[in-house]
């Protein structure tokens, strides 16, 4: 290549698109923080003893166009065939108005979990709609705002039954007609809680002494039967009964709640979310009123704001891991908000009539198929069904299955049986093709005419739904595309996302989710594949997954990876199970003590509790580092039973602990394993690695370091990397499992497979040098913010040379004593300046943790710093008595457009200070749509369903 061609090469252009500050801006920032160069800053920040000795060996960075061409080759290796496997996964039509305006819209997919409700009212409303949809269709009292997948939701239901029930039994009963992948995840969860899983026929439940049970309705083989008597008899024995159900079926069949179920779980995937070779999808859980405070996951509730107006928020947060730690109801952090929103919009768009029509059509097509088969001499395993039939095929099973495969049709292969499931995409041509395989000569039209006289004959009368659902106005208003488009935009406009400005949440890494990375997500070659299709049809997914695992091994210094965990919390769980299985394999199953620093993420102790570990807290010193003296004492005290230590690196205090290798060596010397939480991997890539430091296992948050968007509260992914000695203990899967068949932690072997292309694309376009530069720029941005704010706010922790890692903690406690203004007041006031708040009161109460990421440019960093400095000046005015403590712009924040238009302005500061406090807000203004939300009112007056029509009229 000539010198001119080389100079015009745009191969590495993406790195400059991803990183915010250009070279000139970096020089200004380095000057501000008194660093000679970027490399000099890194040398001052990252301890020399943990620096990698050689650069990462990754393929050269690709341009956006080249990356898309490469990933298209993976996609083309997948074979999308007509699929009737069912088993909890179905083809669906994603309404294009939802595809374009939600799934492909950064206004929806770049938002964060709605911890700050004043700037999250849009997706909070949508998630409330989701809860209402689930409550209506299941016939239950309260629902959460999504879980990771149906199988993990079932495992969560099991632990809910144990917490809420009165039985002393350790037995959990699972019906033998539950989806196999669900049974496997339940077995994994039960083992480490010490529960005994008994699998049996539904009718044997009343004779089984159990604390809880899981039934499937309709069953995995399609049977629809009235479970009322079985549930009633089981409950008389103090057994709480959970039922896995299907939302579309619930439009026609009697809902599980009306049969008396205590808990109802399932997947909302078929409500407009592609199968995606297993995910991501939104699962759901609904339960009775009396169990609401023991239910896991996010719950959206109705409250009021400071003016008494209706406002939404996340309710009952004291159940969750970030507050209750090892006593939490679950370790769940990320849910599936984006997918729950899609499913809820599917229900809003179609309404009761539309959903019922889709259900009727799906059922009618299934009834036609069943009638044709029975008229041709085939026997069905069940004559009562909704969308799935199982045919007793005996010795002909393999021949019929092979015939279907030759016709490019996927059926479900069972022992002496074949299963067929229909969905909203099934056509008459599909039935004709199936009739050809089974040598059925019947006419579809003639069969349809015969069935029309008794449309629901295949649903027993006792199992037919008679109650209404989706009656709330929101499900009966937005049925034209124009109406729906405007509703989606109306909600989007209420929310703050990366389209508006920086989201400087510490420990959350809200970096760019580049458009090029997102494009393959909606390709049908990735979206339309069933996770249990024959493995050879997923050659593209297999190749992409193996290549991604190899890249992640190189980046982390680990020897093997599993992509199965659906979230960071799920990855933690899989990692601790790997450690415990390793100890068990060596005859040391008694090792159950997990050391956790006091600064740890709340998920860490919550996860350790889920593996029945004893959590022992290790102190941190005044500089935020693990206290080695206390660590040594705890190791000595628990040496015989020491299982592991869970550390985060850099620490949650935002510093690189210089003695981290020593920590690992101390634990290893005592026979323990080191779990390194990958939440802060964005400050490691290319500079150091968990494997190099001495860790044995980590999860990676692909939705942080590796650019999968947060989606307003999910999806996420938490793959785990391990050293070779732990590789045999990675999670397996009963279907297409690479690591064996057991210890699954997710419903599908590759977890949320369809979002893996995002992280693959990011790594491919950055290359080794680009990834390393991104880490350096993230550190530069954090140190720049820290140095600009340090004259105005105390910075809590810094490293030996006065530097921070990729985030910094500013201490509001002394300022609160001095001025009366709290960290919450600052967080809410930042909304008036056009920013999402930093992380509040974590890892230290009364602080704000700021992580700007590498993607924010100098202008945005300055805008944020200017806002924080201006807020500090406002605090001084309160301290000096210019504004009273009970009436000032900080305690009254955030301010809305309604505030601006008030006829009477009785505040001691002008409207301009309230609403346009900076020059930047006069150029471009984001408006919160409610005033400060009253959290206490919301929990004391808990309402987790859509407000009545009168609230809309007001």
Curated annotation (Swiss-Prot):
Q: What class of enzyme is it?
A: oxidoreductase
Which keywords annotate this record?
Answer: Oxidoreductase, Pyridoxal phosphate
Q: Which cofactor does it need?
A: pyridoxal 5'-phosphate
Keyword Amino-acid biosynthesis, does the record have it?
Answer: no
State its Enzyme Commission number(s).
1.4.4.2
Reaction(s) catalysed (UniProt annotation): N(6)-[(R)-lipoyl]-L-lysyl-[glycine-cleavage complex H protein] + glycine + H(+) = N(6)-[(R)-S(8)-aminomethyldihydrolipoyl]-L-lysyl-[glycine-cleavage complex H protein] + CO2
GO terms for MF: glycine binding; glycine dehydrogenase (decarboxylating) activity; pyridoxal phosphate binding
Write down which residues bear the modification named N6-(pyridoxal phosphate)lysine.
Answer: 704
Q: Which GO terms describe its biological process?
A: glycine decarboxylation via glycine cleavage system
Q: Which GO terms describe its cellular component?
A: cytosol; glycine cleavage complex
What NCBIfam families does this protein map onto?
gcvP
**In UniProt terms, what function does this protein have?**
The glycine cleavage system catalyzes the degradation of glycine. The P protein binds the alpha-amino group of glycine through its pyridoxal phosphate cofactor; CO(2) is released and the remaining methylamine moiety is then transferred to the lipoamide cofactor of the H protein.
Q: How does it assemble?
A: The glycine cleavage system is composed of four proteins: P, T, L and H.
What is the recorded name of this protein?
Answer: Glycine dehydrogenase (decarboxylating)
Q: What gene is behind this protein?
A: gcvP
